[in-house]
Amino acid sequence: MNIPYRTRLKLQRYGTVALFVVMVLSLIWFCWVVWLERYVVYTREGATIDFTLSSQQLRGTVATPEEARTDIGIYYNEGEDAISTSTELTQLNGYYITVQNMVDDFEGVKARLTALAPNTAVMIEVKNPYGTFYYPSETGYSRSQAVDVDAVAEMINELRIRGLYVIAKVPAFRDYQFGLNNITCGLPIGTGKYKGALWMDNDGYYWLKPTNAGTLNYLTTIVLELKALGFNEVLLSDFQFPASGNYSYTGDKDADLLSAAETLLKSLATDYFAISFGVSSSTFPLPEGRCRMYLENVAPSSVGMTAAQATISDADIRLVFVADTNDTRYDQYGVLRPLEASDVLEEGQ
């Protein structure tokens, strides 16, 4: 259908006028709603309009800031059960517990521990060179069947609560199970018919390469477990190469041991947690940091000479002798004695 030109012009004008009228009416409606909003009163029954309200009138309560309270008490715990916040290492004087102690008389071990005063150092052997754990480890290797590992964890927690300084002893590079299951981490036989196979010491244990990534990751996992369990310090014993044997190692032994110690110390030690090393000689270049050097099988007559060979700072604090007698020549340095010695040494204290 054709619409004449004149008719189209009229329709266009009518449409423009209608659109303008709609826009004006919409603007008037919007302004009216905004103006009306000031008179709307909301109640439980709904909304009503009250034209008697003033636009300046405030309804409700004006919020004011709460006055500062001055009657809040602060409790300062300065008693014997207060937790020490000191980050400084102090000289150790305490006792050690072997795996055999716990196997033979676990209840007797616990009874002796109850007599020890807060801040006494207690070292607990929590893993043997075979690879058996004496705490509830999640590494996947065997847990002890001779000792209740959950009871050991409970004992550790009790010592921590009582304020004793608790140290875990773990073989670092001597581990039969881990070596057997991770052949590339172990020291190989150097010559002969079985060259390249895992080397085993006279006690039947495999030894691990100190700088091997698998070895260091395994030790890191163990240390983190022990830290979470509540230990203040972990001693990595057997932190050395075997003294002799037909094994092959092409690296610099001294440099690699130091490198392993520095790596573990840097990644694991904190202001409140120490990583220490059980070494074969006091000449070991112990890295600076929150760590100690532990020496075993040092006769009382050799204490002075052994300590003189150490090149570490604060030797009276960072050098610890694991002794088997009550000889007082050890007391100038850190010393840990068999727990049985506490029957005499703690008497009257």
Predicted regions and their residues:
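N-terminal Lys/Arg-rich, disordered targeting/topogenic segments
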Residues: 1-14
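Hydrophobic membrane-insertion alpha-helices, especially the h-region
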Residues: 15-33
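Substrate-binding cleft of secreted/luminal carbohydrate-active enzymes
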Residues: 32-40, 44-46, 290-349
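Aromatic-lined substrate-binding rim segments of carbohydrate-active enzymes
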Residues: 73-78, 84, 128-171, 244-274
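Active-site-adjacent "subsite" loops/lids of carbohydrate-active enzymes
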Residues: 83-100, 173-224
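Aromatic-lined carbohydrate-recognition surfaces of secreted/lumenal glycan-active proteins
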Residues: 96, 165-174, 235-237, 255-299, ...
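Catalytic domains of carbohydrate-active enzymes, especially glycoside hydrolases
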Residues: 107-133, 225-237, 290-293
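Glycine-rich, aromatic-flanked loop segments that form ligand/cofactor-binding clefts
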Residues: 121-123, 147-198
